Each structure stands twice: as structure tokens, then as C-alpha cells.
Amino acid sequence: WIMGHMVNAIEQVDEFLDLGANAIEFDVDFDDDGVAKYTHHGMPCDCGRSCTKYAVFTEYLDYVRQVTTPGDPKFRKELVLLALDLKLQRISSEKAYAAGVDVATKLLDHYWMRGWNGGRAYILLNIPLVEDYEFIRAFKDTLRKEGHEQYNAKVGINFTGNEDLDEIREVLEKLGEDEHIWQADGITSCFPRGTERLKKALEKRDTPGYKYISKVYAWTLVRSSIMRRSLRLGVDGVMSNYPDRVVKVLKEKEFSDKFRLATYADNPWEKFTPI
């Protein structure tokens, strides 16, 4: 999965897909009551990027729905995963539940259309800190109450704050979640980061019977050398400001027979087992 990073303006969606991304990550900004208002990152953000691009959250969902609905004039078959970077760290933890209800409802109304020809992409809920775990409970509760639990099959969970992997597992156990789990490891592209935690996450993913990580990705990679380093370790995905650089690296002899771009036919919740 090549994840385009910080794709917050509607016009950036096609721009990043044209560069080779098959997944996009966008920031979801909340008001103080936990209502999702905009796709917006704000200052500071990654080096060399504009931090201020934004869209109204519901309008953004309307657009990506069209891009991921077969038969729609705007359909792009390559876009298979949407990662919502939920800016819950900006609001009180007490509002995490309200935020989960709001995001689930808006996805039902604007993306899935409650079953009426909605978008088909998989959804990854990127949660910054384990203390905001009530968001997940609220999200699942809302799908159940609204009679649309079928969408759980399309939704995955990912804690992105580089917290202790065992703490993350404990929270997932408390929530009763043991599938559809990704694990991110990374830092803003402005700073270097070692591979110690990334290696630990990959080790857990590859441990037979370990359920709490099915995919691991590294973020936000801009240098080809760091992309190569991550691929050698065996990541499932790379988040980048420059998807075209990832595409180029994947074509190199060392990687071209080991990796390929994920398509809609690839299940993002299953561990990859090499043949």
C-alpha cells in the first residue's frame, strides 16, 4: 500500500493517485464537542508541505465516495484504502466517544450511503493515542444501532502515536478487538527515526497466532534510501509525500519480484504469507 500523506484538499485526491498512491491519508479536525468539521492538518506539518489545505469533511467524503464507486464518472480503481487521521489529541478525551458517533454517522450518510451505492474502499481509523480508545467503541456502537454492522468488514484500527506495543494490545483486548488491526510506526518527515520499534511491530505481526497486528507501515518517508530500508524489513505499506518515489523504488530489481501494488482484491486485514 502506497499511502499518500496529508491529502486534505479535494483537488489533491486525484493528484496523489496520479503520482501512484493506491491509498490516501487525510486529517479529520474536530470542534470542541467532537464534531468532525474539516479535513485539515494545520501548523506545524511536514517539511516542504503546505499545512493549511482543507475541505469540509462531509464534502470530502462525498468526493472520495465518487472516486471509489465503480460506474461513477470519477471512479479510480486504484484507490482502495482511506486512512482517516483522527486529530483526537486536539480535543478532550471525554469527547472521544462523541467523535466516534459523529464520524461513523457521517461515513454512513456521505460515504456508504447506508447501502445505496456507496464507496467501496477500505477504511482505516488512525487513532493518535490509546487514551482515545472510546472512539472505537462509539464507532462500532453507532454502526450497530443504525443497523449497518456489515460495514465493520470494511473498517480497520490503527494507533499511530508510537506508543508501547503491549499497551496497545491491552487496549485492543479491553475493546474486544483482535482483527483488522494495522500498526503504524514513524515520525514527521523533518526528523530521522530509527527502526527499533518498527522491527518489534514486524516481529509481532510475524508471530504465529498473534492477532493484534495484521499489517505494518512506516511513515512519513520521503528519502528513497529510507523507503528501501523499510521495504527490506518487510513492511506492508509506506506513507509518503511523494508516492512516485515509492513507485520508482518498487521497480528496482531488489524489490520488483518481492512487492507489488495492492489492488481491491487484496484483503488489508489478512496477514500476508509469502508463497
UniProtKB/Swiss-Prot annotation:
One of its GO terms (biological process) is killing of cells of another organism. It is an enzyme of class 4 (lyase). Expressed by the venom gland. Mg(2+) binds at residues 25, 27, 85. It is found in: Secreted. GO terms for cellular component: extracellular region. Dermonecrotic toxins cleave the phosphodiester linkage between the phosphate and headgroup of certain phospholipids (sphingolipid and lysolipid substrates), forming an alcohol (often choline) and a cyclic phosphate. This toxin acts on sphingomyelin (SM). It may also act on ceramide phosphoethanolamine (CPE), lysophosphatidylcholine (LPC) and lysophosphatidylethanolamine (LPE), but not on lysophosphatidylserine (LPS), and lysophosphatidylglycerol (LPG). It acts by transphosphatidylation, releasing exclusively cyclic phosphate products as second products. Belongs to the arthropod phospholipase D family. Class II subfamily. This is Dermonecrotic toxin SpeSicTox-betaIIA2iv. It comes from Sicarius peruensis.
